[in-house]
Amino acid sequence: MTSLQAVTVPGIPTLTSGDDVAAVIAPHLAALTWPDASVGLRGDDIVVIAGKIVAKAQGRWHRAGEDPDGFRTRAGIPDQLGLKAPVDVKREAGQIRRGLAARFGGRPGVIISGSGRSCEPGRGVLDIALAAAGIDAKRQGGEAVIDAVAAAAGVMIAPDCPVVVVRGVADVLTWED
């Protein structure tokens, strides 16, 4: 790895229960324009997806104040609703990766990220990987790379832009989920 690039994916619509995440984001990935004027997703890119859109596709809505798990996400969520954390994220990451590989070829990596407050007061919010697919976590430093990529993308992820593509870390990709 000599350089790292990250680009937000504009135009992702709000997902609803039952949506296929890979199918919804694929047209936007295909139209993605990079700083060097290249277009689209390459088979050696990593797609970082906010866990919130996976939870929406899973229909994880609840009424505010009624979540028995005590977890809820608030950014970009109507006041009367809450959104539980996505479930079975490893399986979801694998399904999304396979869907993107079928559409774009190669072996794209997928990270489903989530954000939370730092333990240290005043340090703000940080993004971590909830799950990953197509990235070799077993190689030396693999898990650290996954969280570092999630954190880098987290700087760019926003309620209106929940997907970021990272280029430049192909050496950690694998054909396995």
Task: Tell where the protein language model's regions lie, with residue ranges.
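Phosphate-interacting basic helix/loop segments used at nucleotide- and nucleic-acid interfaces
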Residues: D19-G40, A85-F104, P108
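A structural signal for small-residue-enriched, beta-sheet-centric alpha/beta enzyme cores
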Residues: T2-T16, I46-K56, R60-A85, R103-D177
